[in-house]
Amino acid sequence: EPGTVPFDRVLLNDGGYYDPETGVFTAPLAGRYLLSAVLTGHRHEKVEAVLSRSNLGVARIDSGGYEPEGLENKPVAESQPSPGALGVFSLILPLQVGDTVCIDLVMGQLAHSEEPLTIFSGALLYEDTELEQV
């Protein structure tokens, strides 16, 4: 169902800055963070999501692939997601103290299993005190 994705199976949460109930990470330090996610949808179902930093979209994941404007006349079969399609991203973001990061599901349903099919991870690469002054 659309909304913020709560990654409730936490493998590591040093400092407790990720809230598994809300799905929101709050940056404890200003710096550069590496953020990654793999989103797995139900078979034959497109998954679309947005990585948000302090409620502003930063990156978009679309398991159906990129569709530029003007493709409305293509056959439906060409625009369907393939079985087992994934949405994946990995990026480095500058975060200030108190910035929040979350993944908001826009469309589709994520697969649930005992296996870790859908994951989110983040790590501070290095602290940057100049970001605190911005």
Explain the meaning of each model-derived region.
Residues E1-V134:
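Extracellular jelly-roll beta-sandwich "head" domains, especially the C-terminal globular C1q domain
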